[in-house]
Amino acid sequence: MLSWLARVIKGIVIALGFILPGISGGVLAAILGIYERMIGFLAHPFKDFKENVLYFIPVAIGMLLGIGLFSYPIEYLLENYQVFVLWSFAGAIIGTVPSLLKESTRESDRDKIDLAWLWTTFIISGLGLYALNFVVGTLSASFLNFVLAGALLALGVLVPGLSPSNLLLILGLYAPMLTGFKTFDLLGTFFPIGIGAGATLIVFSKLMDYALNNYHSRVYHLIIGIVLSSTLLILIPNAGNAESIQYTGLSLVGYVIIAFFFALGIWLGIWMSQLEDKYK
């Protein structure tokens, strides 16, 4: 029973990766120790089918609960305390980086190619994500665009470190999606997002499973590069994105509070990583 409840809680935490800017559901799944099993199940669904279904049912329940429970308070906090919330998120991500670095060398030692891969990914993904607003603009909240949103959410699960909420903010789909989650809009929001997510999981899960099994170190160094760049970007104002972080009018006390929440976030990230080592 405790194991079942623990998996429900893991699902709730992973759901945060769908709705928090800068957070990746895949990273959270990796931190909580279920990422590789999830990828293996998606890539080979008929292998240990019953065992895996029973394992992931409470995770799925937790994800639905997490989306329903956190959409409204997160929307409120981002509207009223954006700077403090985003810095605490960034701290939590930074706190998990040591765990990802440790995981990256689980099967082989780190070499110069790994480091080059990490920093190249950091630079290219950072510049690409920052410029995305100026290239594609924003999208309306339509059925097809929510299918795209679902595909991005699924990629955020398949590719740890990729924050779909960051991309949805840039595309202008984040706020409409959050509103749909908050009101449990099944046909207008959940259904198209489910179509996009399901199709993406089916198409890309085998590719990710192959990459992890054959290029484990390279994949994780790519992940770390994206984690670092996406974390940096949520802390930098972007003139092309009206929903990006804003520091206007912040006092000295405000910066002290930022430092406190950043440190608190780092502690939370480290604690989550320790939970992975203990309970995965």
Predicted regions and their residues:
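Multi-pass membrane proteins that catalyze or facilitate reactions on polyprenyl-/lipid-phosphate substrates
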Residues: 1-20, 24-280
